[in-house]
């Protein structure tokens, strides 16, 4: 195993005052925040959906799910992540 194999590249982002990271392989892209179109949901952390190049992508407010205080600002982004055949957007404060 080479020394390079020991390092994993991460995308680091903030939710409230906390820092989190995702493996770069899981991140498809990072886009500027725009208000998702609302959908009927029983939870406050499902924010809605966006259209991304013809695909409907659900958007989640993970900060709300974790009970963290977070505000939308001009620096807010939506991180588009993929897991298997599923794609979703996650609202983050900064990247």
Regions found by a protein language model. Name each.
Residues 1-95:
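An acidic, low-aromatic, low-complexity terminal/linker signal
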